Amino acid sequence: EKEYIEELDSTGYYFVHNKTKAKVFYLENTDEIKTFSIGFRTPPKDSTGVAHIVEHTVLSGSRKYRTKEPFMDLVNSSLQTFLNAMTFPDKTIYPIASRNVKDFYNLMDVYLDAVFYPRIYEEEKIFYQEGWHYEMEDLDSPIKYNGVVYNEMRGAYSDPDDQVSEIISEALHPGSTYSHDSGGNPHHIPDLTYEDFLNFHKKYYHPSNSYIFLNGAMDIEEVLAYIDEEYLGNFDYLEVNSKINQGQSENKIEILDKTYSIGAGEKEENKAYYVYGLTLGPSTSPMDRFMRSILEDIIIESDSSILKDKFLESGLCEDYFSQVSTSISQDFFIVGKNGDGKSLDKLVKIIEDGLKQAVEEKIDQDLLAATLNSFEFSTKDLGIHKGVLLNISCLRSWLYDASPIEALKYKDTLAHIKENLDKGIVEEYIEEKILNNPRKIQMTVRPKPGEFLEKDKGQEEKLRAYKESLSQEEKENLVKETQDLFEYQTKLDSKEDKATIPKLDLKDISPGVSHLDTEVIKDGDKDLVFTRAFTNGIYNMTMSFDLKNIKAADLPYVSVVFDLLGSLDTENYSYKDLNNQVDIHTGGISFSPAIYQNPKTLAYKVQGNLRGRTMEDKIDKYLDL
């Protein structure tokens, strides 16, 4: 499959590896930052955090790269612009990026070796270090749980917002892949055995279940040949069942009452959460994805949103927020935070009455235009990590057996929404997908002091009983295993192991710098500087003013003046109207003074800068503002 994607000024190539059926998607363009990523569909069947632990452990040494932390070694020895790994609710990805060709190959090779040939099969201590292990310092000490992911998730679960988010996912998708925490619940992580951990890797980390993404200017035939010869060609096809369990949720409104944990000594008053949640249904459609993001802003997140003032006037909660999922389930929920725990029905009424009113009376067109404008900028401007973000974007369709190109093309969808803004497209979507949605949860999540402490005590009792069940010899072995793990963790890598980590020589680094296509035009005493580059229709503009005539005594006031610019009424607009017009027609306008020093003469120059962004069809309005 080959298709030009106008929105990205890129040509997409979709390949399937002959032998293993590994899936490869390449975006050919002029981006000097070359991006590679390999991902796997990794649906969890419980909350032991196995997907998260595997992500950590495969980066702890492999067949070729023998140090304990090749990942951190690469951070210090490469020219990478991105190097990370990420666990999602249903997938795990390993993206890297670099401008340097040799560095790109080095990073790609380290990651491919890591995912396909990790040391986890030969060194059990990697699992104990990164996942969890029993720890007993001496015969008189109690047995404890310890481990990198275990401790990380204990920290995550201390945040009430994170707890509530997991409770919502479980409530919306009972019995499904999304009812489990792929990151790991700290009270379930110790249920994971070393054998189950290895089996998870064996099952899912196979080329037949892989999604390989490439972006940028590169010799794609050479790259594909390398991946095939060094890795994919060493495997045979394997039928991998990585199907995502969508669950069997009933189409009904559920009124739920749950609890989350707070500190044992904390007060419970006004710490309840209210949740109004629903799922828009399985979809890889750009329209559904776009509309969900737009609805977030229009309904609650924007200062001018439909419900913001109504929420604040009600006094039911201290704060409100909404959230959308990144998976196929298309979740959308509104949360009221720090309420009295008695007002769920009032909050639901505010939400549904407010949305019904918006549908009947129509949403303010300026709010719609400003929201869509903001969304368009965020969609088009991906920044320096563009390749990684495109990888995540294409998986929104690709992971669910649709074309990766589907999630990247948005021009027609965006145009359709723009053309129909004043014809009720958003109002119709709210009515159909939210108000008339047959599957909703309305939930109160109450604070329970010491809830985690109770679970911790249960674990401590379990560990106490486990210690009592051990013979003297088994206890001595556990103390020795604790000491052995500590020695493994603190032992420095050998010179031989360090030598396996790829490094760049000076000859591998180009001494030149990238040059932009820039033109300078003289207009009287002004210099007009034009830089040409693919910006997806976004015009970035800077206007600089020489402030040499300002007296030295007045310089402290310059920053005050620039802070006030854009925050005051003008000749043509009130402050509120001005900001509204800026939101509708630009990607933001900022004002800032700057002081520059000539490195030769050491003379100073004070300058005022106006920076802003706009779309091609809005330049005149931008300049007017």
Set out the residue ranges of the language-model regions.
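His/Glu-rich zincin catalytic helix
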Residues: E1-F71, P95-R99, D109-V110, S158, ...
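M16 family metallopeptidases and their MPP-like homologs
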Residues: E32-P43, E69-Y117, E124-E135, D162-H187, ...
